[in-house]
Amino acid sequence: MNNIWWQTKGQGNVHLVLLHGWGLNAEVWRCIDEELSSHFTLHLVDLPGFGRSRGFGAMSLADMAEAVLRQAPDKAIWLGWSLGGLVASQIALTHPERVQALVTVASSPCFSARDEWPGIKPDVLAGFQQQLSDDFQRTVERFLALQTMGTETARQDARALKKTVLALPMPEVDVLNGGLEILKTVDLRQPLQNVSMPFLRLYGYLDGLVPRKVVPMLDKLWPHSESYIFAKAAHAPFISHPAEFCRMLVALKQRV
């Protein structure tokens, strides 16, 4: 059985698990891990096949969630960014007793555009899959550039993301492809109507991957959840707005 790379920091009375996005690894949280570990017992995770969690191939969302859960604390706040938001949501659906609160960051229950649903055009995702086999480092870099576009700190935010990717060996092409397949095919809009734990959704107003149009649609579909939009953030609000981001999580902790 392959093990997932997992690091625990801090001694807070509430556990907080952070799940990163596609192509990245847990180093992406270094801008906020000191602050958060002073309030929580913080768990930094490399998703299977990413970063230091080697030896995994492409996985379905359900298998990825189960693999992560095997090493997780009994009960925690689960926070997932982008693709990680789908993994955290899947865990909330299948093991609600282990999720004190669900937080999704710049994530969509359905990343792919559908009828009357804004998202990434399926041919864009298919194009990324095609380009992965040609030049996967450049493809990952293009995807990262999309994530910070439009913010005041776009250049330096993109550099921070690139540094995270380059700090560790690149994931295998089939793992990257499998992640894109999840983004292309998964739709959790209806299932997430049934979660009952506190559910906080955080967005960036300038996000080019998760259009802000989905926010009111999901407010209506999931009236039990709360949403907040960072006015000047794109796809990585914790990098562009770290202090504000951490404050929201500390406030959530008081409520669980």
Swiss-Prot record:
Main location: cytoplasm
GO cellular component assignments: cytoplasm
Keyword Cytoplasm recorded: yes
Source organism superkingdom: Bacteria
Positions that bind substrate: 22, 82-83, 143-147, 235
Pathway assignment: Cofactor biosynthesis; biotin biosynthesis
Xref: SUPFAM superfamilies: alpha/beta-Hydrolases
A molecular function GO annotation: pimelyl-[acyl-carrier protein] methyl ester esterase activity
Catalytic residue list: 82 (nucleophile), 207, 235
Keyword match Cytoplasm: yes
Protein known as: Pimeloyl-[acyl-carrier protein] methyl ester esterase
